[in-house]
């Protein structure tokens, strides 16, 4: 029976099989012999073979390793399509942009990212259902549970805390903002437009509402609220409003457009209005950043945030 178990154990190896043995186990004082099954498997000569002895060399005799500087990374061709996430990643750290978007090194999403995805998916499916029939809070919370992504969190306590916070966010949203008679015109609306003749921008509107000729682009946020000054300077909202003025997307005028950040944690809404001239300037600013990306060698930008890099 022992021989059979030994054989079964050996046949479970997928790439390599290591057989180890010791002359003494635990507090035993009498030296033990190697199992005869090992001799049967490998042969006596292989088991009794002694490894060649190598005299230890002084570490001082070794030449220090000279690290060769890493060659700058240069894409094969100019990058011609961007999203808001790509642009902000480059602004944060060019090296992270290179790893994530050019070399496409996969990273596992964090718990906070999965939390945001779960909330967005629950709201999206809730409104889709509301377009077909009457819905209640129980529908929204059931969809939240069904869409919950339960990985990436630092601990089970972290996951439970965020799940509870999300439940409170959605309950507040339903009680204070949901109206069955006033549903969005578009949900999770994908868009792409040409910022210049050669540069395409892609993205997704969380929600688009229309009242006569007035359009409101709503972006749900699960994180910390920003103030009006930060919202007015938001590159993300500038990009959304630029997209909304494109004839192939909404074709709205600057005067008829409002961009709103909806902070689900507090129920706070902060809206942004831009003039036609301000959107033209925003377009220039985005073009300059993209020009920097295409001229970059994607060197790292070290800082305290490196400890949190995926």
Residue ranges with predicted function:
Residues 70, 79, 276-308:
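Polybasic (Lys/Arg-rich)
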Residues 1-46, 59, 89, 290-310:
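C-terminal accessory regions
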Residues 122-195:
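A non-catalytic, helix-rich entry segment at domain boundaries
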Residues 2-6, 111, 115, 119, ...:
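Hydrophobic (often cysteine-bearing) scaffold residues that line and stabilize catalytic clefts
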Residues 192-283:
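Mg2+/Mn2+-dependent nuclease catalytic core
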Residues 25-27, 105-112, 129-134, 225-227, ...:
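Short, polar/flexible loop-turn hinges at active-site or ligand-entry regions and domain interfaces
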Residues 18-20, 24-34, 135-144, 184, ...:
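Substrate-binding beta-hairpin/strand module that engages nucleic acids
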Residues 39-129, 166, 181, 185:
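C-terminal, charged and often intrinsically disordered regions of DNA end-processing helicases
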